[in-house]
Amino acid sequence: QRDDAKFLASIPCSACFNEQRTGKTPTALEVIKLRRLQEERILIITTASSIYQWKEEYETWLGKPCEVCAGTPTNKMKAIGSWTHGLVVSLDSFKETESRSGLVQPILAREPKMVILDEAHKIKNPKSANAKAAFKTKNIPFRLALTGTPAQGKPYDVFSILKFLFPSDFGSYWRFIDEYFEIQDNVVWQGGRPRHFKTYDNFRPDKAAQLQEILNQFSTQRKRKDVMPWLPDKFYQKVKLNPSRDQKKYLRELEETYRTEDIITTGTLDRLVRYRQICLDPTLIGLDGKSPKTEWILQYLKDYPDEQIIIFSKFTSYLIKLSEQLETSWALLVGSTPTKQRGQFIKDFQAGKFKVFLINIDAGKEALTLDAAETTIFTDKFPPIGSIEQAEDRFIASTEEKAHKAHKIIELMIADTFDEQIYKLLEKRKSETDIINNYNQYIKERRKSNGHKSTVPVSGSYQRAV
């Protein structure tokens, strides 16, 4: 990573094409340090589902504030106005379309010194709004593109990244195609009429090597299995989401008493269950309000439409509610799923017949091989830890080829709540009893910090009946 950062920082415009899980984010942030731009405005353009992750990494690695351009139009403009160091914006918010102006102009007006384009393959179509927005950053002095797949489909898909980095050298798409690829004229007959079109799937003689040599001059292209063979089969990404206004209200009321709105809890365990449900989706228990976790999942599915994904939850009711909002193919596996149907779901998922597999943690802890998935999302976790570990192991590779796939486990949590604390306790392999006792202590400390005197029992050990 240090060697890559030094190389990438040595030229004004560069690209990190290293495979997933080789540390492109810290490498990019190290480039900022090496260029001595820590005190300058840095623009980071990424997918909407990654903006908070970038903020956390930026502030951790550089020790400087990083604004997030998200939420309402007012909040986005406020973030741009407060921008002093880092600013993270989604490509969807940044780009201009026929129906909205986007944030290109107000962001560029702040004159950032460097732009990092994450998931740069998303601009592969040079005529798309994504690409046109990226091209407008051409006057930013330092530009860095990040992607593990610079040419996802065809070799010429790399053109837009080249234009983003070197607009004066790669200004014309068709000049690029004519230079490097053999153009073939084709005709098909439709309704008795010919339709002519061109294809250019093959390189001209020696042009593949020439284009590769150009890429080598400004990019790193490392393979995970070559440079990091010690990596574990799976890696974790914690996504901390801000609670909605309604969630803050409900959680605060539960911390102060045993009720919120019309929900009355009857003890510590019941209160903790309701607390977890509110963090997941307030509507699960008949309360108003949005679910930041659901919104994040739906955005992630839009950002990565080609991924096969497993989504785990302890609450079947949430998985059912989530399924009603999915705009892609899915299947639901819970405790009541018949054995025969369960087997068919597994077979179909492995064959790529649907994209999202919704699974109750307790129902999916055994007898499942789902290595077609690259990503698993946990919307919530709760003991026993053994069930969670079994669920995480559903995509252990069944073939040598699949052993080299990146297996990512995303943990969704509501920031600065006990929902976040549960994940920390599970990392220490705490039991259900330990977590409930910690919840009692958490409530006690929260009430104390809020200046409330204790009027309800908030301490004491909980022992689960055996």
Regions found by a protein language model. Give the residues of each.
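SF2 helicase motor core recognition
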Residues: 96-97, 153-155, 317-323, 342-343, ...
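Conserved pre-motif I regulatory segment
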Residues: 1-17
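Conserved P-loop NTPase motor "coupling/switch" region that bridges the ATPase
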Residues: 41, 60, 114, 131-224, ...
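A conserved SF2-helicase RecA2
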Residues: 383-389, 395-466
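Conserved helix/coil segment N-terminal to the catalytic DExD/H
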Residues: 74-86, 91-111, 132
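Conserved helicase ATPase core of P-loop NTP-dependent helicases/translocases
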Residues: 310-312, 320-321, 327-364
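Interdomain linker/hinge connecting the two RecA-like lobes of the SF2 helicase core
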Residues: 12-15, 126-127, 173-177, 183-303, ...
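Conserved Walker A/P-loop ATP-binding site and its immediately adjacent core
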Residues: 27, 39-60, 153-157, 314-316
